[in-house]
Amino acid sequence: MTVILAIESSCDETGVGIAELTPDGSVVLLADEVASSVEEHARFGGVVPEIASRAHLEALGVTARRALDLAGVQRPDVVAATIGPGLAGALLVGVSAAKGLALAWGVPFYGVNHLGGHIAADVYENGPLPECVALLVSGGHTSLLHVRSLAEPIEELGATVDDAAGEAYDKVARLLGLGYPGGKVLDELAQQGDSSAVPFPRGMTGPRDARHSFSFSGLKTAVARYLEKHGVEADFSPADVAAGFQEAVADVLTMKAVRAATDLGVSTLLIAGGVAANSRVRALAEQRCAETGLTLRVPPLRLCTDNGAMIASFAAHLVAAGAQPSSLQAAADPGLPVVKGQVH
């Protein structure tokens, strides 16, 4: 058995996960500890890179100690870390710590892709991942991916050409005065509204648009213009606006994801990333997968957002596939593409 300790520090969550790779290739989660600095960023309306980096420095040691104690592990067999994509300073904190631990313990270091980690998080509760189309949707990324296995390069079928879906959520939440982060609170507000009361446009859904690409900037602008025109009216309903916006996002995401799976002839759709926790995205995906005979896989809510467990899982799959460790000179790559699962 191989025990992997993994560090996630790409944005504002400091995560340390510990997983065990068993002889049969299964990955078992032993510990998952997360410290978030989201409250420190909330007063600025978004993530401040310098604050995020400092928060990682302050939280990482304590978080790692908690994870080791919870797992009952003294010395892992492998140390891994998110090496990209993400905020440069934040990545450097986690990567530097992981390299130091690997050197001190005398174990291999694996610098792995954050986006691959989101996909790998699914295996803890849903078992080995078959060939699938993955809809990776978060604050910084919205992509459709063809995943043959977690040990092979991931193919990007399409991505957002402007705002990520999670970014659009935060911006619309700010327009509605809901604060930051906006995803969860906007979702809750939308559940109180009528999604058909305020119809909003669905970007890049025309016959000439790229089948597997997304655009949310026009939707964000449409919400802003609606608020400028109707926000002062006596019967204005923020809940209806939230519901209409959320329906537009969920409609496009799930429609294109199901279509991509059908185009490729695969039978499984995986939705991963922070926006995979959204209630309407999950419900509409379940409905459309049932209608088309697709198997839907979504990680549990606690593993949708950034965490160390997902990085441990992805690293475990690389180890199982015989991937060589990363060099201790491997550099963090803020723009690391999803097709590159590991930096050597």
UniProtKB/Swiss-Prot annotation:
PROSITE patterns: GLYCOPROTEASE. Disulfide bonds: none annotated. Its cofactor is Fe(2+). Binds 1 Fe(2+) ion per subunit. CDD domains: ASKHA_NBD_TsaD_bac. GO terms for molecular function: iron ion binding; N(6)-L-threonylcarbamoyladenine synthase activity. The keyword Ligase does not apply. Its main location: cytoplasm. Keywords: Acyltransferase, Cytoplasm, Iron, Metal-binding, Transferase, tRNA processing. Gene3D superfamilies: 3.30.420.40. GO terms for cellular component: cytoplasm. The keyword Metal-binding applies. Required for the formation of a threonylcarbamoyl group on adenosine at position 37 (t(6)A37) in tRNAs that read codons beginning with adenine. Is involved in the transfer of the threonylcarbamoyl moiety of threonylcarbamoyl-AMP (TC-AMP) to the N6 group of A37, together with TsaE and TsaB. TsaD likely plays a direct catalytic role in this reaction. NCBIfam families: gcp_kae1, T6A_TsaD_YgjD. This is tRNA N6-adenosine threonylcarbamoyltransferase.
